[in-house]
């Protein structure tokens, strides 16, 4: 079984860091509950490019980005026992080295690291299982035979579960569900 594991919003709390950087740069505090859509930068009156630049600034401070779960290393190791785990991540190219440092710092082991350019869909990379928070990826995969574990986040709450799109709140839950397959 080949497993594609996302970073932002699944392993790393990029949203928390974006909130912090935005507050530092503008003096305006936003709450995580405001992030109810994938393109939430519109609510901040930002362009896509301005938001991508903010992501680069956030990841340049990678040591400050918190993991979303306290036992990530163990969870990814458990995933590796049920399949081959690859990191499949879509991001500005300038953040790749920062992300790799973050993964190493948190002792997250994986077989390969695949960067997906911003204009490309992760769905073009064929895996048996995807663990991701993207509502766009869920939309692309909904009529396929590929399984997606949609990591629960405020920006994907409007995605309906389907037979192959399963909502999860933790990587532990993914491991449990995969063990039953």
Where in the sequence are the language-model features?
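Short amphipathic alpha-helix with an adjacent loop that forms part of the alpha/beta core around
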Residues: 121-124, 173-181
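Active-site neighborhood of HAD-like aspartate-dependent phosphohydrolases
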Residues: 1-51
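Substrate-recognition "cap/lid" segment bordering the active-site pocket of phosphatases
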Residues: 90-142
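Short, acidic loop-to-helix structural element flanking the phosphoryl-transfer center
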Residues: 57-87, 92-100
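Acidic, Mg2+-coordinating phosphoryl-transfer loop and its flanking beta/alpha structural elements
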Residues: 131-169
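Short acidic-hydrophobic, aromatic-tinged amphipathic segments that line or gate anion-handling sites
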Residues: 113-116, 165-173
């Amino acid at each position: 079984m080949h497993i594609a594991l996302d970073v932002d919003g699944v392993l790393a709390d990029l949203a928390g860091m974006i909130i912090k950087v935005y507050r530092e740069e503008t003096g305006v505090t936003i709450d995580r509950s405001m992030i109810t859509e994938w393109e939430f930068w519109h609510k901040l009156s930002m362009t896509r490019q301005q938001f991508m630049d903010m992501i680069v600034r956030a990841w340049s401070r990678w040591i400050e980005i918190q993991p979303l779960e306290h036992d990530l290393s163990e969870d990814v190791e458990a995933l590796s026992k049920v399949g081959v785990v690859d990191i499949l991540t879509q991001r500005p190219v300038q953040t790749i080295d920062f992300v790799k440092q973050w993964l190493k710092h948190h002792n997250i082991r994986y077989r390969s690291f695949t960067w997906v350019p911003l204009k490309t869909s992760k769905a073009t990379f064929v895996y048996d299982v995807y663990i991701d928070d993207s509502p766009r990826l869920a939309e692309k995969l909904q009529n396929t035979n590929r399984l997606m574990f949609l990591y629960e986040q405020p920006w994907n709450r409007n995605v309906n579960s389907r037979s192959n799109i399963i909502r999860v709140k933790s990587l532990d839950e993914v491991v449990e569900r995969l063990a039953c397959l």
